[in-house]
């Protein structure tokens, strides 16, 4: 997905999914470490969670998110998105992933998917399982689209993530992080040229750019783990829409919450000194 689905998890977690892990850190703490670019410590938090809750898919899928975020940081993926217009995105080069990180990323996703499907056979309305599968498909879409430049595969995973998100919202309407998957899908496809939108709709993916922004706003305001990521994606969208005040407000809030991440200070400076149109020099 163009803006990263990612990522990549809501207020609807079951009690098991938000328990404190053995070292006193929760999944919330793990995500805070990710947004502050402390990938090694986040990995340890997610491993601890898996040891405490071996049947819960959330630990593994969160670990996969950490691997993806680390690659985004190493390759400058999010930084590039702030000043890439749709034409330059289409012409982007395929990046060179770290083979070891890629293998660990997919291994974590396979583990999460296996645990999630196992839980769904026992309870089709298992919220953690549906959440993990929503996130897993979104992470695959991000990796395929933003790192490997496999656009068709990315759209396939985007559709998959949206389907899981809709199932999750049917179980619990207050799983606000699930709106990240559907919002990104709506925004990206709604931003495409009309003939491409038509072809994508034939494949069963709907598109409404403004609805996508509204769903991202919902996650940004009321989401849990993914609320900060939704704010990042919204800031990117606002830059592309040339809405500098909103983009700057979001980036300031992110800078203040995650001071160890230089991206936010850097992008505020670019907003203040560079024109909104075109790519960064």
Model-assigned labels for residue ranges:
Residues 2-12:
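Bacterial N-terminal signal peptides
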Residues 13-17:
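Sec/Tat signal peptide C-region and signal peptidase I cleavage site
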Residues 18-26, 33-46, 55, 66-125, ...:
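Short coil/linker segments at helix-helix boundaries
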Residues 51, 220-221, 255-256:
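Amphipathic alpha-helical segments of tetratricopeptide repeats
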Residues 62:
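N-terminal carbohydrate-binding/catalytic regions of secreted carbohydrate-active enzymes
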Residues 225:
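Flexible, substrate/cofactor-facing loop regions flanked by secondary structure
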Residues 229, 236-281:
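A cross-kingdom marker for long, charged
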């Amino acid at each position: 997905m163009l803006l990263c689905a990612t990522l990549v998890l809501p207020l609807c977690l079951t009690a098991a999914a938000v328990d404190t892990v053995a070292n006193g850190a929760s999944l919330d703490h793990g995500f805070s470490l990710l947004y502050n670019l402390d990938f090694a410590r986040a990995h340890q938090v997610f491993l601890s969670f898996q040891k405490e809750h071996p049947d819960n898919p959330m630990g593994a899928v969160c670990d996969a998110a950490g691997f993806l975020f680390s690659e985004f940081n190493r390759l400058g993926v999010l930084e590039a998105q702030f000043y890439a217009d749709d034409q330059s995105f289409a012409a982007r080069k395929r990046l060179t992933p770290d083979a070891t990180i890629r293998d660990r990323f997919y291994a974590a996703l396979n583990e999460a998917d296996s645990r999630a499907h196992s839980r769904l056979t026992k309870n089709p309305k298992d919220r953690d399982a549906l959440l993990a599968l929503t996130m897993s498909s979104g992470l695959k879409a991000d990796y395929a689209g933003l790192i490997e430049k496999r656009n068709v595969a990315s759209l396939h995973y985007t559709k998959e993530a949206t389907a899981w998100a809709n199932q999750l919202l049917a179980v619990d309407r207050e799983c606000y992080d699930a709106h990240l998957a559907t919002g990104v899908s709506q925004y990206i496809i709604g931003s495409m040229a009309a003939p491409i939108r038509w072809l994508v709709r034939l494949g069963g993916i709907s598109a409404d750019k403004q609805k996508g922004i509204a769903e991202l706003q919902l996650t940004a305001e009321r989401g849990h783990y993914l609320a900060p990521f939704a704010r990042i994606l919204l800031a990117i969208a606002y830059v592309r829409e040339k809405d500098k005040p909103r983009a700057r407000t979001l980036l300031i809030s992110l800078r203040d919450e995650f001071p160890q991440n230089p991206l936010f200070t850097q992008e505020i400076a670019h907003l203040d000194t560079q024109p909104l149109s075109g790519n960064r020099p």
